[in-house]
Amino acid sequence: MATGIALVGPGAVGTTVAALLHKAGYSPLLCGHTPRAGIELRRDGADPIVVPGPVHTSPREVAGPVDVLILAVKATQNDAARPWLTRLCDERTVVAVLQNGVEQVEQVQPHCPSSAVVPAIVWCSAETQPQGWVRLRGEAALVVPTGPAAEQFAGLLRGAGATVDCDPDFTTAAWRKLLVNALAGFMVLSGRRSAMFRRDDVAALSRRYVAECLAVARAEGARLDDDVVDEVVRLVRSAPQDMGTSMLADRAAHRPLEWDLRNGVIVRKARAHGLATPISDVLVPLLAAASDGPG
């Protein structure tokens, strides 16, 4: 059993995981950029879970190394999180990366070269509310690869009541999630929540875009059938009409967007395989401009 657990990035996903750990009797060290006395998760239909802090804001305030470090910052914040990794990690630390995309290990391993880095796919609908607490709709489920480090992390979260699958075909699982994440770009450019996918014209465009992404996923080794296109579009069309996405929230708050790891990656990987990406060629520059300007 892990005796030292640190959570870097107590946002929506991070708060969800921290709350599960706290409920199971663990006391995760909370690390972020905003000082708070604690964090709170409110799952629909359940009692709130308050995780006592403080949320530390300086690596100098904490002692390391820890057994498990859960990195739940946005990928755009990885460089800013490096001092935490330096302070809290060594060769015995398992670093679980709870981020979108398919490049978690490549992006994080340079910041903690001696640690085992475990990419984790998170399936949950968690959203930070204006008052600061996090709303969770339904259950949270994670997928990690196989292997000793991944299984150690999976065992920790299973002990906390989470559903965690160790998938030997993690490549396929990661690309399946990316097909869903990529559609969030439509929400950012339209400024609308999930109800927008109930428009027939948007659904048709979504199918074409997911099919474009699917070709890239297969070239990268993902074993996904043609049926996944309709499956993904049905998923977003059946979501609660008011459901948002972290990238839409970032756009509203004028924060940098995860456009490259959700959408730009499709273009980058496609170029390596000589694949055309006509929809991405329009979508990605607009997302990049929305994120990084100028203007």
Curated annotation (Swiss-Prot):
Q: Name one GO cellular component term.
A: cytosol
InterPro entries named in the record? 6-PGluconate_DH-like_C_sf (IPR008927), 6PGD_dom2 (IPR013328), ApbA (IPR003710), Ketopantoate_reductase (IPR050838), KPA_reductase (IPR013752), KPR_N (IPR013332), NAD(P)-bd_dom_sf (IPR036291)
Q: Which reaction does it catalyse?
A: (R)-pantoate + NADP(+) = 2-dehydropantoate + NADPH + H(+)
Q: In which pathway does it act?
A: Cofactor biosynthesis; (R)-pantothenate biosynthesis; (R)-pantoate from 3-methyl-2-oxobutanoate: step 2/2
Q: Where does NADP(+) bind?
A: 10-13, 33-34, 74, 84, 100, 126, 255-258
Give the UniProt record's GO annotations in the biological process aspect.
Answer: pantothenate biosynthetic process
- Could you list this entry's UniProt keywords, alphabetically sorted: Cytoplasm, NADP, Oxidoreductase, Pantothenate biosynthesis
UniProt: substrate binding residues: 100, 181, 246
Q: Does the keyword Glycoprotein apply?
A: no
Pfam family name, one? ApbA_C
Provide the E.C. number(s) assigned to this enzyme.
1.1.1.169
Is Metal-binding tagged as a keyword? no
Q: What class of enzyme is it?
A: oxidoreductase
Print the miscellaneous field: Was identified as a high-confidence drug target.
Classification via PANTHER family:
2-DEHYDROPANTOATE 2-REDUCTASE, 2-DEHYDROPANTOATE 2-REDUCTASE-RELATED
Q: Write out the similarity annotation.
A: Belongs to the ketopantoate reductase family.
| Protein name, UniProt field | 2-dehydropantoate 2-reductase
State the organism of origin: Mycobacterium tuberculosis (strain ATCC 25618 / H37Rv)
